[in-house]
Structures are given as structure tokens and as C-alpha cells.
């Protein structure tokens, strides 16, 4: 899948649009097919001034889309639900695994 990532902090030019492995929903997660993202102030501040904790760090705190898979412990969401979500990273990608409680 494609995602917006960075390997070093800096100006917008450090962002890359690359192929990364598909995320997998854990037992408490939903997997979202991302249809819209939100660019938050923290996205900009962190990209500019904070080294990413891992290579190919997928940026983004917020997105909306459709649930395409649910973890084994999730009862509050089902495949096909349209959701918004907020978590600490990973929303700027084609798919995003996020705790169901954050949707």
C-alpha cells in the first residue's frame, strides 16, 4: 500500500510517498480503508522538529474511511461501518489499523 512517510525531520521535502507493508488489525483494532485525512498542527510540528522513532514513519493523526476488518475483541464496529479516527500516527496511508475505541 502507499503511505506518506519520513525518515528524518525537516521541511516538507522530507516526506516521501512510498510502498509500505499493509497494516494488520490487532484484537482491539479496526482496519480502515482511508478515504480522507486531516493535516493537524502536530503533524507539521513533529515532521519539522522531531526525529521519527522508526524508519519510514507514517505520518498523520486523523482520518475517515470505511472499516474493512475488525479485531477478534471488537464488538462496537463491523465491516462496512464508516468511521472517523484519531490516533498518534499512521493515518496518511491507504489503510490504517487503529484501536476501535479511537473511532
Predicted region positions:
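Short N-terminal binding/cap micro-motifs at the start of the first secondary-structure element
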Residues: 10-15, 41-42, 75
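Short beta-strand or tight-loop elements
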Residues: 13-18, 63
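Glycine-rich beta-strand-centered segment in the early N-terminal region that forms part
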Residues: 21-38, 49-90
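Cytochrome P450 core scaffold surrounding the K-helix E-X-X-R motif
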Residues: 42-48
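Glycine/small-residue-rich loop that forms an oxyanion/phosphate-binding "nest" at active or ligand-binding sites
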Residues: 84, 102-103
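A structural motif shared across PLP-dependent enzymes of the aminotransferase-like
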Residues: 87-100
Amino acid at each position: 500500500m502507499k503511505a506518506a512517510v519520513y525518515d528524518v525531520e525537516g521541511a516538507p521535502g522530507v516526506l516521501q510517498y512510498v510502498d509500505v507493508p499493509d497494516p494488520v488489525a490487532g484484537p482491539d483494532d479496526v482496519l480502515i480503508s482511508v478515504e480522507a485525512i486531516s493535516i493537524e498542527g502536530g503533524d507539521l510540528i513533529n515532521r519539522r522538529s522531531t526525529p521519527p522513532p522508526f524508519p519510514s514513519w507514517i505520518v498523520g493523526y486523523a482520518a475517515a474511511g470505511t472499516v474493512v476488518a475488525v479485531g477478534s475483541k471488537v464488538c462496537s464496529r463491523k465491516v462496512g461501518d464508516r468511521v472517523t479516527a484519531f490516533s498518534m500516527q499512521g493515518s496518511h496511508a491507504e489503510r490504517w489499523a487503529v484501536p476501535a475505541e479511537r473511532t
